Amino acid sequence: MRKLLLVIDMQTDFVDGALGTAEAVAIIPNVLREIAKYEKSNIIATRDTHPDEYMETREGRHLPVPHCIKGTAGWQIHPAIAPAIDGCLVIDKPTFGSTALCEHIVKISKDEEISVTLVGLCTDICVVSNAMLIKTALPEIEVSVVADACAGVTPDTHSAALTTMKMCQINII
């Protein structure tokens, strides 16, 4: 069985930039611990990616904090994480969940049996969105989330997202 690790949105703006939190900074060692368990060919990272006109988008009107603008320092994978995933596939996504990531995982699953584990940010937005997309597309595979290698917008919303995923038969480790 091929085990895949998805490193979700470990970007500067979400760690210690425009939308950073102490909890996001605190998970860095745990994310690195999980990355170290996998071969680079089995790691896929995502980057939240917005245009310069972000504030004019629907998301920008509801979350009026410019972040992860393509090409900016905040859009880059955080410097504490980037060396560990150098050479891994990185998928840019324009919103919370990535259909491109999901399609890639489905394609891999056609050739071999897989399991998927997710780590990263934010538990209650992008981690839950991607975990649910994958679980919906591939209901028979094992999908897991490493709780101490994820952080939410707040500790309460982190816990709520973990509960939601558990109720949808996603393993919470």
Where are these regions (language model features)?
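A short helix->loop->beta-strand "cap" motif at the edges of active sites that frequently abuts
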Residues: 39-41, 139-142
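Short amphipathic alpha-helix with an adjacent loop that forms part of the alpha/beta core around
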Residues: 101-112
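Active-site acidic carboxylates
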Residues: 1-90, 110-111, 153, 159-166
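A short glycine-rich beta-strand->turn/loop micro-motif centered on a GG-aromatic cluster
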Residues: 117-122, 141-155, 173
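Active-site-proximal beta-strand/loop segments in catalytic clefts of secreted hydrolases
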Residues: 46-49, 94, 121, 148-149
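Glycine-rich oxoanion-binding loops at beta->alpha junctions
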Residues: 92-103
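Histidine-anchored nucleotide/phosphate-binding helix
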Residues: 32-36, 128-138
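Short acidic-hydrophobic, aromatic-tinged amphipathic segments that line or gate anion-handling sites
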Residues: 91-92, 171-173
